[in-house]
């Protein structure tokens, strides 16, 4: 059984411009050695290959493809689409594939490939990330505030808007976070992400521009978001899917910044990019993992 864990590292220095509206790229530069060493250690411990894909001709050519398809938005969004393009390239070489963002810290030696049977379907995790009253209010197409482009409420609304526009039954209760994805070749092929991009983005332009279920201050924040697109394609293409659950995708963000990860948290996703907080974990003493030589 050929197994792979892969990630992407492209920083704003390499790409020659900022990463859009998102301010955390310097944090990834600073903590790159620590995070890569930990991810590689995990891959080695479970007998999987580990690959880091960076800025180079493959990524430049991919951005050219996006521009030719008229779906290019920014370097940041290109990186998010790139993870699926890479999966499509890798599916002929590996039986089971785990993608994790560089800000994911493996906090276990348990083998995810043995614990979750990916032959039963690709696996991701979705979660609500809003105040309880707004989670409820979103079900009526409204919020008490104008969300940001990257808020889960915006992505979830976009996912539902796409499904509604195309008369597709939403297969996922909540939009997936694609920072951790357990994949198999048949699932990757059935999602058909890159080949579907142009058509889906035309649909996004439609649902963004016309009145619909969601308030205009929500739809006005729609972008060509990979997580909404992926979730829609899983639904539209009837891809067999299972949930990773919070143990395999424990989210650390602004909502729970003061909360230490549970000892049961196997993969910690530092969406807040506060990598220095890992030094305070009682479950691991990981600052020694930083390569200083």
Positions of PLM-derived features:
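Charged, glycine/proline-rich intrinsically disordered loops and linkers
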Residues: 16-24, 62-74, 133-167, 204-216
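Long, compositionally biased intrinsically disordered regions
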Residues: 265, 280-293
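Catalytic core and acceptor-binding pocket of nucleotide-sugar-dependent glycosyltransferases
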Residues: 157-278
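A structural signal for short, well-ordered beta-strand segments and their strand-loop junctions
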Residues: 5-7, 49-54, 98-101, 106, ...
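Short catalytic/ligand-binding loop motif for oxyanion handling, primarily in non-cytosolic enzymes
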Residues: 13-15, 59-62, 106-109, 114-115, ...
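N-terminal anchoring/stem segment of glycosyltransferases
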Residues: 1-82, 89-93, 221, 225, ...
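GT-A fold catalytic core of metal-dependent nucleotide-sugar glycosyltransferases
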Residues: 79-146, 182
């Amino acid at each position: 059984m050929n197994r792979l864990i892969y990630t992407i590292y492209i920083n704003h220095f390499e790409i020659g411009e900022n990463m859009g509206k998102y301010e955390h790229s310097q944090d990834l530069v600073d903590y790159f050695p620590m995070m890569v060493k930990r991810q590689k250690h995990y891959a080695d411990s479970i007998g999987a290959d580990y690959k880091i894909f960076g800025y180079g001709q493959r990524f430049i050519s991919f951005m050219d493809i996006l521009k030719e398809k008229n779906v290019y938005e920014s370097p940041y969004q290109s990186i998010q689409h790139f993870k699926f393009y890479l999966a499509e390239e890798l599916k002929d070489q590996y039986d089971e594939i785990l993608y994790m963002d560089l800000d994911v810290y493996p906090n276990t030696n348990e083998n995810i490939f043995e614990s979750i049977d990916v032959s039963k379907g690709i696996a991701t995790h979705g979660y609500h990330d809003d105040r309880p009253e707004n989670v409820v209010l979103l079900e009526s197409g409204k919020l008490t505030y104008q969300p940001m482009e990257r808020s889960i409420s915006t992505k979830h609304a976009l996912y539902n808007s796409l499904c509604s526009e195309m008369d597709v039954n939403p297969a996922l209760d909540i939009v997936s976070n694609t920072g951790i994805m357990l994949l198999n070749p048949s699932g990757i092929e059935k999602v058909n992400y890159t080949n579907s991009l142009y058509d889906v983005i035309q649909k996004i332009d439609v649902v963004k521009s016309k009145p619909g279920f969601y308030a205009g201050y929500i739809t006005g924040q729609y972008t060509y978001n990979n997580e909404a697109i992926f979730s829609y394609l899983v639904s539209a293409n009837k891809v067999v899917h299972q949930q990773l659950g919070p143990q395999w995708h424990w989210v650390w963000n602004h909502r729970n910044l003061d909360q230490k990860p549970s000892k049961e948290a196997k993969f910690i996703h530092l969406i807040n990019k506060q990598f220095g907080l890992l030094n305070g974990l009682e479950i691991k003493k990981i600052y020694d993992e930083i390569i200083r030589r």
